[in-house]
């Protein structure tokens, strides 16, 4: 930016000044003017990550069990000297392991730094229409953040009173569709038939199904990628694979869809997956026995939690995820949230319309859940006085 000022000597009435020549007041203007060109967004708010020890963490839907022994062995066997080398841009070892496990071709697999990275890349790649993309009004709150960041028009579609998707609402003109199945934060699972009806009604749009929680009782729509070229199915290692800290997400789609995503990815950052992640991820995804065993434990604990929470006066939509979206009949969700926190038990609460009466409770170990029930019983007794 150029500034003109009068010379005290009068030899030159005006001059072109740099920042070093101008007054403090003028300098403030120069230093702040860059903000006019900043993309300002309201960022996504992640779940609280408490630093203290001896807590019960049921607020971010992490898996309460350790990673696969195969992943641990891969970590221990990793040669630290390899850290000086760039990883393979195509992460072929991980991609091949995922393709082998899910019985698809490697060309139908995309990997990224968690499913957030995968979906963000999909937004960048596929949602470039002047028409709004569509997603539920109660859903994963990162969707509207990505839309804002990338300047994508969007429209929130209301769920039904029982937190379900009405397929007909997604037949309107759009620039793309995304929703989770099971939904987050409700845990409600939609049928494959309903999802296919949405895909059929939108042949000119990419439809993204976010299956972060599908392994806890749902049926993946993965087989439909062979039938619909415009379908992208996204999954993650963060929930059912016990590896949230490794940040591994992946997607399935037609070869054409995946090629477009890789073209964009390699134009932004070729080396998204580090060497340790590739090795450990490949080992973990091949350990099907451990994966199925931990999922079964979480499902069993979840079903018991439904009974116990019902006995304590909670209602909730039937969850097919690793969490329960619960509302108490009389006690305030905010009060319960705060009282649990005092007892070092962390759950998720949103002070937002429609869902402000609900708590999202991650399914922990049986011991963690028993501590939760004991604390809730105590809190509810105090609230009833």
Q: Over which residues does each language-model region extend?
A:
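Active-site phosphate-binding strand-loop segment of PLP-dependent enzymes
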Residues: 2, 155, 160-215
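Phosphate-binding glycine-rich loop
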Residues: 92-132, 330
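PLP-dependent enzyme catalytic core of the Aspartate aminotransferase-like
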Residues: 1, 23-28, 193, 339-348, ...
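Conserved PLP-binding catalytic core of the aspartate aminotransferase-like
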Residues: 299, 311-343, 359
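PLP-dependent aminotransferase class I/II
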Residues: 230-310, 314-317
């Amino acid at each position: 930016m150029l500034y003109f000022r009068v010379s005290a000597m009068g030899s030159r009435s005006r001059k072109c000044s740099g920042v070093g020549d101008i007054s403090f007041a003028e300098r403030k203007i120069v230093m702040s003017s860059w903000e006019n060109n900043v993309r300002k967004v309201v960022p996504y708010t992640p779940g609280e990550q408490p630093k203290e020890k001896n807590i019960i963490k049921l607020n971010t839907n992490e898996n309460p069990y350790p990673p696969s022994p195969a992943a641990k062995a891969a970590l221990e066997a990793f040669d630290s000297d390899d850290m000086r080398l760039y990883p393979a841009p195509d992460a072929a070892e991980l991609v091949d392991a995922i393709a082998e496990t899910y019985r698809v071709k490697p060309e139908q697999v995309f990997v990224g730094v968690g499913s957030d990275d995968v979906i963000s890349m999909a937004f960048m790649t596929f949602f470039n229409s002047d028409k709004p993309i569509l997603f539920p009004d109660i859903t994963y709150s990162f969707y509207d953040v990505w839309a804002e960041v990338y300047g994508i028009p969007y429209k929130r579609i209301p769920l039904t009173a029982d937190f379900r998707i009405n397929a007909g609402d997604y037949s309107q003109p759009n620039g793309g569709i995304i929703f989770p199945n099971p939904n987050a934060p409700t845990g409600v699972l939609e049928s494959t038939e309903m999802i296919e009806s949405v895909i059929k009604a939108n042949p000119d749009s990419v439809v993204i199904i976010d299956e972060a929680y599908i392994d806890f009782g749902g049926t993946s729509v993965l087989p439909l990628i062979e039938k619909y070229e415009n379908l992208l199915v996204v999954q993650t290692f963060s929930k059912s694979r016990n590896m949230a800290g490794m940040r591994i997400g992946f997607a399935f789609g037609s070869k054409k869809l995946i090629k477009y995503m890789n073209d964009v990815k390699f134009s932004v950052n070729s080396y998204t997956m580090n060497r340790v992640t590739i090795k450990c991820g490949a080992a973990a995804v091949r350990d099907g026995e451990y994966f199925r065993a931990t999922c079964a434990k979480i499902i069993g604990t979840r079903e018991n939690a439904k009974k116990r929470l019902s006995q304590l006066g909670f209602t909730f939509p039937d969850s097919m995820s690793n969490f329960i979206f619960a509302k108490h009949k009389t006690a305030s969700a905010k009060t319960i949230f705060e009282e649990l926190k005092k007892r070092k038990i962390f759950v998720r609460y949103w002070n937002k319309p429609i869902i402000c009466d609900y708590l999202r409770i991650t399914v922990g170990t049986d011991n963690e859940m028993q501590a939760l029930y004991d604390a809730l019983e105590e809190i509810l007794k105090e609230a009833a006085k």
